[in-house]
């Protein structure tokens, strides 16, 4: 049944009525101060908060402009104390008083003073999620939280606690601060190759004083609602004909009832109609948990689907009666009915082999019994300081995901376990969240104390988010199996088997049972990237036998990640991995000029200025040095090579314009490289590898700096996110030009679940826009039918066979028109897509000035773009500072005489609409022209 370990953190339900026998005081309403010897003064503080932000509000420091990520390191090195003013008005007729912290980051000591002058303190080292202190010995009307102290400078000291552990040389990955693997704190707080290392501290989540009645009281710490098909097992596909099972478990604080009852009510989310009410059976009390189960025979609720045109579900309400026959207390809502997700890693069957699928094993997701193509990206922490991340900000980010035709985000470890409201937003918007435990790119301790601590962390979080239909998977960590174990094998081959054993001890023997004991509806993988498993035996000491490198040539097994910074092979299809699923891949680029201007002074806006280079953390410093020019030059050089190898080299006389053009050029390379890979992976859905997912690195930025992101800090879209929106459409036409052999193939790829049919028009133009005689020997139109989750080749030739006078003066325009049914829909929908191909790199093309004309309709709030004298490649609409939003289409091709009317979605506007006068349009021609 349900498994709970120790003080497995507290989840406050602040809306619970006082009838539950509790009095709750939100400590965010109290007055707080922040102090430190390093500051030598006291400043006002907020709660929840983080030290850097309180110092910023008090005017002690500024934003991390320029190189302030280095200049502010004194904050992480100091000890800091939050102190409340006396908290008055507490009740004196309650049986116990509890102090509940939802999140303290990270090494904290709490001291409490109340009117009887009695002091209670407890060290917290560290707090993985929430925690609650034992009941105070007396109920008093006044409490002073004398100190919530956070210890700084521990990254060096913590190593002394683990002197018995010796890692193999050159294996552990230090980005800036050392020894992060010993601390249960957001690992990217200590630096990563896409973000700064502020190592923030503070009470980053709410805190409460909870008073429980002497006779009848319930305080909900956590709720686990597991909804699955009868007889379902995590690693096997559920039988969709079986009835639903609801297994509910409530972790409570206070005296456990002897004979409690539990009940659920299921309603249609939209109409509010009650579909069924049930009393749970086999209610049991164990530890601090009350658990019950019921089978929903005969109930067929509306199901949740990812990226459905309408998210129609049923909502579950859970109630608890402390004593049988007494009035029930509503303790939980918002359990949306959904078929559990299943990660299929089973062996390829003979039926699949007969369909042309290569031997090996599957690696794809299934929802409600349907396999589907996962399209998305990787989510990193959206800010260095979580307390300024708002629900509105995440909602806007997720809207960009939906608009970008993505249905899945991989929640990368190691950030923080996501807030509940983020899962709520994913539920609402139909976004799947591949979730991971917070272990990344490191070897971690495996002593009993460490494992006991992380076991509580895992149990709490599995139970906390299990009711969300957006939860797609739990993975044990990031790249532990695919990166860290091979690093051990290379650096210390004699120790390899030992560290494989340590890996299995934690990520399989410990984590897998903890997941399976707390949910039957979600699959588990011990690492983000694996070759899958050989077998599962839950009675074995290592219940999942990983495949590792026990693979056979010609067979495919697991998922892949891929980073190749050799730009000479960026568009070589033979350099891309062939697997069942791509969970990470990418290349970095510069943010736009407007985003750079938020953080860097004008005099520093040069491509290789000191400030720009030191804000680039790829390659990372590997320590706390502040002159990482040598490593940074590697990443800057990679971007430079990507530009000069394939694109016109910007050469503007004005240094700001030149800097902006270079930033844009790096984005063109990044977007083209991702597009090339995603077209390759999506085509794989119809190839022997049966490839069913691509999640690129990364969705968004944590600050203003070079990174792999498609959405810049502040919300501005790079070229990448626009191009991903286009190439993630349901049915696409894609050209594949092999520049070595000269072959040119055109494929149609579909992620619909049923066949789609239509035509593709193929039109050859020279770059002045004139049709090439005889269409270069290419058919003008090709009909096609493509199967569900499949791809089909509609045209193939060799460049040498085409009637092209000059391959540097030619472009193939592809226009698809089709009809088919979207997933989970009975209606036929018209679908279109446009693409293009050139047979020379952009830098070598004989482009002409396209004569772009730009207009704006205030009545329609649309922009009109027209090419008048040549083909416009990489047509790019841009908007000025003072507004944030996105164009409905961008980075497109325009032929002469072609006019596009494009809408713009405004998210923020501080210009009172004046921004429209400063919209600009450019193309590849502008990158080439000297100015």
From Swiss-Prot:
Top-level EC class as recorded in UniProt: hydrolase
GO BP of this protein: carbohydrate catabolic process; glycoprotein catabolic process
Active site: 479
Localization annotation: Secreted
Enzyme Commission number(s) from the entry: 3.2.1.25
Glycosylation-annotated residues: 40, 79, 247, 282, 347, 550, 608, 658, 738, 790, 798, 830, 918
Keyword Lyase among UniProt keywords: no
UniProt pathway: Glycan metabolism; N-glycan degradation
Thermal profile of function: Optimum temperature is 70 degrees Celsius.
Homology family: Belongs to the glycosyl hydrolase 2 family. Beta-mannosidase A subfamily.
Subunit structure: Homodimer.
UniProt-recorded name of the protein: Beta-mannosidase A
Species annotation: Aspergillus niger
